[in-house]
């Protein structure tokens, strides 16, 4: 159905992992940046606590129409709100304060850092931000690769690893997930 662009979709094992993480977190408020055809959103929505809601941020009406159909078919559409506009606008319009439990970022790589900062400012202590594609096909370790997306992911990985506000671990599932937990105030490193 999707052809070669289907590679933009998360892998099934990543979907199962996102569902499990959302359940472990008892997430009631989740954000996804980059929705594509909605598989990752289904995975997160299935793991939400009763009454939980997922805000999906995307710019493509074409792909999110497919997502909306899949959400209906999966029985999770009532848990998802979709915003079609640049994610930075959607995130900056969210209320200040620690209201987000869980976030998944899988969108334009050059803006990962911006999305990180906007979500982190609204993430509860011990909340989780998960980034996709952090291995980027192995190209992040090849310093000769100076493509814009590769540089952005490499910089994000380095920044988050040294950010004292969080602790993180890279998980080599599919193209790599970076799990980033917000530290509680006064938490000892």
Task: Identify the residue ranges that each predicted region occupies.
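S-adenosylmethionine/decaboxylated-SAM
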Residues: 4-189
């Amino acid at each position: 159905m999707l052809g070669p662009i289907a590679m933009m979709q998360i892998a099934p094992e990543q979907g199962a992992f996102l569902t499990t993480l959302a359940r472990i977190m008892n997430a009631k408020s989740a954000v996804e940046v980059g929705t594509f055809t909605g598989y990752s959103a289904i995975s997160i929505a299935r793991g939400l606590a009763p009454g939980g809601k997922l805000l999906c941020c995307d710019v493509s009406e074409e792909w999110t129409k497919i997502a909306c159909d899949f959400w209906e078919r999966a029985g999770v559409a009532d848990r998802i709100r979709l915003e079609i506009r640049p994610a930075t606008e959607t995130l900056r319009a969210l209320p200040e304060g620690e209201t987000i439990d869980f976030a998944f970022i899988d969108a334009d790589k050059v803006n990962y850092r911006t999305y990180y900062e906007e979500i982190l400012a609204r993430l509860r202590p011990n909340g989780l931000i998960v980034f996709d594609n952090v291995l980027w096909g192995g190209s992040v370790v090849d310093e000769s690769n100076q493509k814009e997306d590769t540089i952005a992911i490499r910089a994000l990985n380095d920044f988050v690893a040294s950010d004292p506000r969080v602790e993180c671990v890279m998980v080599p599932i599919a193209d790599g997930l970076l799990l980033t937990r917000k530290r509680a105030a006064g938490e000892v490193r």
